[in-house]
Amino acid sequence: MLLAIDSGNTNTVFAVYDGDAKRGEWRAATNANRTADEMGVWLLQLMTLEGLSQGDIDATIIASVVPATVFNLRMLCHRYFHSPPMVVGEPDVDLGIGILLERPDEVGADRLVNAVAAHETYRGPLIVIDFGTATTFDVVDEEGNYCGGAIAPGVNLSLEALHMASAQLPRVAIGRPRTVIGKATIPAMKSGIYLGYVGLIEGLVKRISEEFGAPMRVIATGGLAPLFAEATDAIQTIDDDLTLRGLLIIHRRNQPD
């Protein structure tokens, strides 16, 4: 079985795949100071609850946008699963797609993994929107090449910034407002963030499609994707497992024939 690890800025997701079937998925706050032993004990306990054991894992793959986490994640794979991990972004890992950028080394591993999964699943041309710590828009052409995109502040990051930088604005949770015109502070904040991001999504999708010069299918992933997809026709598909499935695809592509 394959242990796939997606280490993001906010959370790190661990998933076990048996072929195409996902046998378990667990999430922890990303912390570069968390040791391999701490992660190993935690993960093995959760695997046991799903009927999985340490010996079931025979391969591992890591994608991380936080370089400081990679060492301990490597140690986790070596020490607890006796598996040298495949690490997305390293020269010996073939993604199977072109990266049409001036500085390919600057692209986050998660964005490339999403591009791989999106092209394999839906073909192109595509826009992939990932609602994470940042909200990213990534363009994949019909041949599967990663063409770049746009990066905006994440929804929760924007809400937190409003609270931290403004003396009278409270910390609020994102939600769909009942009205555009808020009659109190919290409804006004929810309207501004939620509907503002709907406008951001629609505006960027329109501009990207116009610049690309062809109709594009829009795939959304990340925890907030359903909340925003219900408010706009700009998003055609929600794919919760896009990043993890991308890791599965990349691992298979790098196996000996």
Swiss-Prot record:
InterPro entries on file: ATPase_NBD (IPR043129), Type_III_PanK (IPR004619)
Any one GO cellular component localisation term in the record: cytoplasm
Keyword Kinase among record annotations: yes
Binding site for K(+): D130
Pathway assigned in UniProt: Cofactor biosynthesis; coenzyme A biosynthesis; CoA from (R)-pantothenate: step 1/5
Gene3D superfamilies named in the record: 3.30.420.40
GO molecular-function term, one example from the UniProt record: pantothenate kinase activity
EC number assigned by the record: 2.7.1.33
Cofactor: how bound: A monovalent cation. Ammonium or potassium.
Reaction(s) this enzyme catalyzes, per UniProt: (R)-pantothenate + ATP = (R)-4'-phosphopantothenate + ADP + H(+)
Binding sites annotated in the UniProt record for substrate: G108, A109, D110, R111, T185
Sequence positions that bind ATP: D6, S7, G8, N9, T10, N11, T12, V13, T133
One GO term (biological process): coenzyme A biosynthetic process
Predominant subcellular localization, coarse grouping: cytoplasm
Cofactor: NH4(+); K(+)
Xref: CDD domains: ASKHA_NBD_PanK-III
List of catalytic residues: D110
Compartments it resides in: Cytoplasm
PANTHER family: TYPE III PANTOTHENATE KINASE
Purpose: Catalyzes the phosphorylation of pantothenate (Pan), the first step in CoA biosynthesis.
Protein family membership: Belongs to the type III pantothenate kinase family.
Protein name as it appears in the record: Type III pantothenate kinase
Species whose genome carries this gene: Rhodospirillum rubrum (strain ATCC 11170 / ATH 1.1.1 / DSM 467 / LMG 4362 / NCIMB 8255 / S1)
Gene name of the encoded protein: coaX
